[in-house]
A protein has these predicted regions:
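Walker A (P-loop) ATP-phosphate-binding motif of ABC ATPase nucleotide-binding domains
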Residues: 5
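Exposed loop/turn and edge beta-strand positions of beta-sandwich/beta-sheet ligand-binding modules
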Residues: 2
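The conserved Walker
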Residues: 12
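Short catalytic-loop micro-motif centered on adjacent basic/acidic residues
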Residues: 78-83
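Hydrophobic anchor at the beta1->P-loop junction of P-loop NTPases
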Residues: 8
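Conserved substrate/cofactor phosphate-moiety recognition/catalytic segment
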Residues: 18-74
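Conserved glycine(s) of the Walker
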Residues: 15
Length: 84
């Protein structure tokens, strides 16, 4: 089977995370969420200004894409959740 990247996107508070987690559980695929990564980064490094908050969000997106490329590069599939 070819590797697949499933994108779960939608408006804020529309149930993206819930749907992505359910898909992950049902399909046995890893799930990456920008918000989960951003929260981890915030807990680790924090931010003090709007500019730093934006940079944290960009960093979270880049980390999510990097992790997805690693998973896909090994021939596995992955679920990405964000408001893209």
């Amino acid at each position: 089977m070819n590797s697949v990247c499933v994108l779960v996107a939608g408006m804020p508070a529309s149930g993206k995370s819930r749907m992505a987690r359910e898909l992950s559980a049902r399909l046995g695929l890893p799930m990456l969420s920008k918000d989960d990564i951003k929260e981890l980064l915030y807990d680790t490094v924090g931010f003090c200004s709007r500019e730093e908050k934006v940079a944290l969000g960009v960093g979270a997106m880049e980390a999510m894409y990097y992790a997805a490329r690693q998973v896909l590069g090994q021939g596995s599939s992955v679920i990405l959740e964000n408001n893209f």
